[in-house]
A protein has these predicted regions:
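Active-site-adjacent betaalpha module
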Residues: 4-12, 27-142
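Short amphipathic alpha-helical segment that frequently serves as the phosphate-/nucleotide-binding helix
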Residues: 1
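PIN/NYN-family metal-dependent endoribonuclease catalytic core
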Residues: 10-23
Length: 142
């Protein structure tokens, strides 16, 4: 519903995609999280479920090989966006990393997170995420 509303309102929609290669298990992340996932050119690299149908409507899709996307943060810094909203998974890893990178490259853009459209690995993380985001000066929607 959120993506569809943004699309109907002619808002820019962007996605980041976790992107790994067949050598994933030899990377730093792969050594700490030894579960092959999001391997490029496999079904697991695609956007999941209903979200996948919106990829063709995206202004931009960023493949990222680490938790955050420097390319996304730089893209936002070159834009005229006054506000950006983040949502997705995994809240305490990829979403949080992208927020921090965006803050690093963009001192003026307002950053929002919709907690109803963001999920972490467990309930404890989800229950404490709001506090961390607010301390990072992120506007939190519930």
């Amino acid at each position: 519903d959120k993506i569809e509303k943004y699309r109907q309102d002619n808002q820019d929609i962007m996605f980041t995609k976790d992107t790994h290669y067949t050598n994933y298990l030899t990377t730093r992340e792969g050594r700490y999280i030894p579960i092959e996932h999001c391997i490029i050119d496999t079904e697991g690299h695609g956007l999941y479920g209903e979200v996948a149908k919106y990829e063709k409507h995206a202004k931009k899709v960023f493949n990222k090989t680490s938790f955050g996307s420097i390319d996304l943060a730089k893209y936002i810094s070159r834009s005229d966006y006054e506000e950006v909203e983040f949502c997705g998974v995994v809240s305490n890893i990829c979403v949080l990393s992208n927020i921090i990178m965006t803050q690093t490259y963009n001192e003026k853009v307002e950053i929002k997170v919709d907690l109803k459209a963001t999920k972490g690995m467990d309930d404890e993380i989800d229950n404490t995420l709001k506090k961390y985001l607010e301390q990072l000066t992120v506007r939190v929607k519930e």
